[in-house]
Design a protein with these regions (language model features):
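C-terminal alpha-helical "lid/dimerization" subdomain adjacent to the S-adenosyl-L-methionine
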Residues: 152-192, 198-204
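Class I SAM-dependent methyltransferase SAM/SAH-binding core
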Residues: 58, 62-107
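Conserved class I S-adenosyl-L-methionine
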Residues: 47-55
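Class I SAM-dependent methyltransferase Rossmann-like catalytic core
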Residues: 14-33
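A conserved beta-strand element that flanks and buttresses the S-adenosyl-L-methionine
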Residues: 119
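A short glycine-rich, Lys/Arg-flanked "PGG" loop and its adjoining helix->strand segment in the class I
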Residues: 133-145
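Conserved alpha-helix/loop element of class I SAM-dependent methyltransferases that forms part
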Residues: 29-45
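N-terminal, positively charged/glycine-rich alpha-helical extensions of SAM-dependent methyltransferases
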Residues: 1-19
Length: 220
């Protein structure tokens, strides 16, 4: 079930109230650009959640603010973002959720454990091409039996939305990104024995998103 996006915008403003103005604006822009109101709905209450490339911890913070009572673990290669995530988590210490963030590159070794939900939003296109498959395979391996991989990334069509995403990353991330076709992502997931459960476009404002939810079956 989708959430009211206006509630998430209010949450983002409150969770990062002490951040610099530019970073506060960035968190609210993420709520407008990403289908968080949908992806949060796929997360069961009390779930263990791994957020790969978590940035400033927004996704896990929104889950906690919406009463999901998750055990959240996020990592990101940007130390400034992780510092902001840690300060945000302090505001949620009485939410019933446990949030932990660490500075880690997705290409480095990951914790050897599995999760109820693994989340990837706008991550793969930032990973160098030679490492993209390995990072995705690690994400799949972290999904426990019965668990979900919630994946969202920029869509290839329509072209003007794709261009908007590319320009955004040139301005904000200062890099030329390397998206993986969504059909390739579906093939990689199938090779990792994950079944496709949800397949839809989730366009927001000028940004295009391909949203996929995969599940690891309880049986082979």
């Amino acid at each position: 079930m989708s959430l009211d996006r206006s509630l998430l915008l209010d949450d983002a403003r409150r969770l990062y109230a002490d951040a610099p103005r530019a970073l506060r604006f960035k968190q609210r822009l993420r709520v407008l650009a990403c289908p968080f109101e949908e992806t949060i709905g796929y997360v069961p209450e009390g779930a263990s959640v791994l957020d790969i490339g978590c940035g400033s911890g927004l996704m896990l913070g929104l889950m906690a603010a919406r009463g999901k009572r998750v055990q959240g673990h996020g990592f990101d290669p940007c130390p400034v973002a992780i510092g902001l995530a840690g300060r945000m988590a302090v505001r949620l210490r009485d939410s019933g959720s446990t949030l932990r963030f660490e500075h880690r590159d997705a290409r480095s070794p990951w914790p050897a454990r599995s999760y109820d939900v693994v989340h990837m939003q706008d991550v793969i296109h930032h990973v160098p091409i030679p490492a993209q498959r390995a990072v995705f395979d690690r994400a799949c391996a972290a999904v426990r039996p019965g668990g979900l991989l919630v994946y969202a990334d920029m869509s290839a069509r329509p072209l003007w939305r794709n261009a908007a995403c590319r320009i955004h990353d040139l301005i904000v991330a200062r890099e030329w990104i390397h998206p993986v076709p969504i059909t390739t992502i579906e093939d990689w997931a199938a090779e990792n024995r994950l079944a496709l459960e949800v397949s839809r476009t989730a366009h927001r404002v000028i940004y295009g998103n391909d949203l996929r939810v995969f599940q690891r079956r309880l049986w082979p």
